[in-house]
Amino acid sequence: MITGMDARRTWLVTGAAGFIGSHLVEQLLLAGQRVVGVDNFSTGLRENLDLVRGAVSAERGSLFSFFEQDIRDRDGISELVSRSKPDVILHQAALGSVPRSIEDPLSSHESNVDGFINMLDAARKVGVQRVVYASSSSVYGDIGDGAKVEDRLGAALSPYAATKRIGEIYAQVYGRTYGLETVGLRYFNVFGPRQDPNGPYAAVIPRWLAAMAKKNPTAIYGDGSGSRDFCYITNVVQANLLAASVPSSSAAIHSVVNIGCGATTTLMQLQQLLRRHIARVVGCQVDQIPEPALEPIRQGDVPHSLADISFARESLGYNPTHSVEQGIAELVQFELAKTA
């Protein structure tokens, strides 16, 4: 058991109906924690909350309270945090997607910067012990190839990246100015069950999986040599709980920490992994699943992304349990079992 999870605390999870947030809510309830969930359903799904309730006992489910609330509503969020009096906030709410931010930068700023400051200030006023918040590997921008280290940043390549970097700065300022303990987690390409495959801003793995399962064509932006550090949701849940529970003396406090696997997979390798595991589960030949089409690289995309997770290991005790292949195998089994 992670240190600090043996005693019951109150946790506020923003973005609770989202992909990552719903997994955090589920794990906290399974651990017997009291959880307050917040979401405005701009990208989160009610179905995810239903899945959470179905995964825990009625007794554990009674520890969960949910509020439909927009983090951009300063007064509403302040009142909710004041009423809930959480010990810890796990802040996952955001408008994700680089392409979305390029098309609509103001909405990204309002959710990812203004909304986050609202959470920080509400936490400060109530005396929340710690805020763990989601940042992104996109903040590394054009730093170049090689493993990304927390203190070496390039120029931001999208409004989304800018919003996440601004959030990191505000969190650190709230720490220095008000003593609010914060830990930022720079996620590297998280994937897993409950990730929405639909819409123009869907992440690559759920989008490809949904298409390949129906033997529909897929597309790679670029020549397939671009690479990412894909990180399974189980690893990300572990990182959040560790960040919320490490002692105040940890070097992670008031810092940002890379959360990935420390290994890269090219987009073409990812295609092959998905095709192989889908073929195994549905009982078809790999060559019955169409090869991807190659399309021009999208604006704001970086060619390669790899996390140096040394600091996460040292400061949090983070140890990813699922490799990309293990995560893909588990994800494919889960998603295709739903349609069997």
Walk through the language-model features, giving the residues of each:
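Short beta-strand->alpha-helix junction loop in the catalytic core
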Residues: 192-194
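C-terminal substrate-binding subdomain of Rossmann-fold SDR/epimerase-dehydratase oxidoreductases
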Residues: 10, 212-340
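Residue-level signature of the cytosolic catalytic core of signaling kinases
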Residues: 69, 73, 197-201, 263, ...
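N-terminal Rossmann-like NAD(P)+-binding domain of SDR-like oxidoreductases, especially those catalyzing
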Residues: 1-190, 244, 335, 340
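Short glycine/proline- and charge-enriched loop/turn segments
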Residues: 146-155, 203, 293-296, 309
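The catalytic Tyr-centered alpha-helix of NAD(P)H-dependent dehydrogenases
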Residues: 152, 156-163, 187, 197, ...
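Hydrophobic alpha-helix immediately C-terminal to the catalytic Tyr-X-X-X-Lys motif of short-chain
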Residues: 166, 170, 174, 204, ...
